[in-house]
Amino acid sequence: MPRKRLTGIVVSDKMDKTVVVAVEKLVQHTIYKKYVKRTKKYHAHDERNECKIGDVVEIEETRPLSKTKRWRVVRIIQRFEPERVLKEEEDIQEEIEAVEGKGGVES
């Protein structure tokens, strides 16, 4: 049987050779039938301490490595780039100012 693989975002890298990965999934509410986001955190083994907070990683199920670690980092899908996030925020702020300047939003 193949091992499970999940994709998530690194939320903590403070431990040696261990990262905490938050994995989001959509679950349908039993009564209201609306889809709701659920987040679960997994401790994953990072052999070379490569992962940093904000990186998107793929983790794979493995044998128990410690009391809480049952996953290992397979690969880093995307590195976190703070410059890109700041640029996107600036672009959004400029768009908001342009709309407000034209009188698009009334007070």
Curated annotation (Swiss-Prot):
GO MF: rRNA binding; structural constituent of ribosome
Record-level GO BP terms: translation
Gene3D superfamilies to which the protein is assigned, alphabetical: Nucleic acid-binding proteins
UniProt keyword Nucleus present: no
Keywords: Ribonucleoprotein, Ribosomal protein, RNA-binding, rRNA-binding
Cleaved signal peptide residues: none
GO (cellular component) term, any one: cytosolic small ribosomal subunit
A Pfam family assignment: Ribosomal_S17
Xref: SUPFAM superfamilies: Nucleic acid-binding proteins
Similarity comment text for this entry: Belongs to the universal ribosomal protein uS17 family.
Function as written in the Swiss-Prot or TrEMBL entry: One of the primary rRNA binding proteins, it binds specifically to the 5'-end of 16S ribosomal RNA.
Oligomer status and interactors: Part of the 30S ribosomal subunit.
HAMAP family: Ribosomal_uS17_B
Protein name in UniProt: Small ribosomal subunit protein uS17
Organism annotation: Thermotoga sp. (strain RQ2)
Gene name of the record: rpsQ
